[in-house]
A protein has these predicted regions:
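N-terminal module-boundary/linker segments of secreted carbohydrate-active enzymes
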Residues: 24-54
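Active-site catalytic motif of lipid deacylating hydrolases and related acyltransferases
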Residues: 58-152
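Gly/Ala-rich beta-loop-alpha elbow adjacent to hydrolase catalytic centers
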Residues: 158-162, 166
């Protein structure tokens, strides 16, 4: 199981160095989300669960602020809106295509906060709006654990906002019983501080590819000065190309090189065409 899972997660992590989502506009809802409803999952038909390992994947930020049918600006996704689902879909499908050959794949729709919320750089505002998103992720994970898992080992994975949700699950929702089944947690594109590592026992940094029950996390830039202010206190970083936590370079089959800059705990990627990965809408996040 280990080599097969690592093979696909290696490819997934490499892809997550660069992916992002697009812009939409549609209505929202403030009702409770019932995760026994198959419509609340990307794919709810789990009759073919024939893998020995599960993965619970939390999608990254894919929506922007939008105006609902009452003319009010909304900052959280309407998970039943078709257009918004279409914007979330590519990111979920990317993860599923990479990981479902080796894992039973579970990914809930949740009321994620908008990209506009992140662009505000207002951490208090972000935390306030994220509470609804996290409430949904908790409800989805509890339903998954009580109804789908059936005692199998599982992996937590999330990118960007999804990584934040994974980190919060590890801090507040994972019990000793659940932790016994946890293979690893992939929290890509977010931040974990030293204070958090010191305060929460299930926030354990991965040191190499053989660790279990740990967090695999990293952020990547092409220049050290491009690191987002939101990640300035991050302490967790492992290179997915060589599973090293030092500055040893890892070389991708795609031709680029990735090395950790120890002073900022961030991967610096060289040998790529920056224009292919530039996202104008998030320019404000850069210094």
């Amino acid at each position: 199981m280990g080599k097969a899972v690592l093979k696909y997660i290696f490819a997934f992590c490499s892809l997550l160095l660069f992916i992002s989502c697009g812009k939409i506009s549609s209505d929202s809802t403030n009702d409770e989300v019932d995760y026994s409803d198959s419509k609340c999952w990307f794919e709810a038909n789990q009759e073919g669960m024939n893998k020995k390992v599960d993965i619970f994947y939390v999608v990254p930020t894919c929506i922007w602020d939008y105006t609902d049918s009452l003319g009010q600006i909304q900052h959280n996704m309407d998970i039943f809106n078709t257009k918004q689902r279409q914007m979330v879909g590519p990111s979920i499908r990317l993860a599923k295509n990479v990981l479902s050959d080796s894992c039973n794949f579970f990914s809930p729709y949740y009321r994620q906060i908008s990209m506009d919320s992140w662009l505000s750089l207002d951490t208090a505002l972000i935390e306030k709006r994220f509470q609804l998103a996290y409430k949904d992720v908790v409800a989805a994970f509890r339903y998954y654990w009580n109804n789908y898992n059936q005692g199998r080992p599982f992996i937590l994975a999330g990118h960007s906002q999804g990584a934040k949700a994974v980190i919060e699950l590890l801090k507040h929702e994972i019990t000793p019983e659940i932790y016994q089944h946890l293979v690893a947690s992939y929290a890509i594109g977010y931040t974990i501080t030293q204070e958090e590592l010191d305060s929460y026992p299930y926030l354990r940094m991965a040191k190499d590819s053989t660790d279990v029950g740990v967090i695999i996390g990293f952020n990547s830039v092409t220049k050290p000065e491009a690191i987002s202010p939101l990640f300035k206190n991050n302490i967790v970083c492992i290179n997915p190309l060589n599973w090293k936590t030092d500055a040893s370079p890892g070389v991708s089959y795609q031709g680029f090189t990735a090395s950790i800059a120890p002073s900022i705990h961030t991967i610096v990627v060289t040998g790529i065409d920056e224009d292919k990965y530039y996202i104008p809408s998030v320019e404000v996040l850069l210094p």
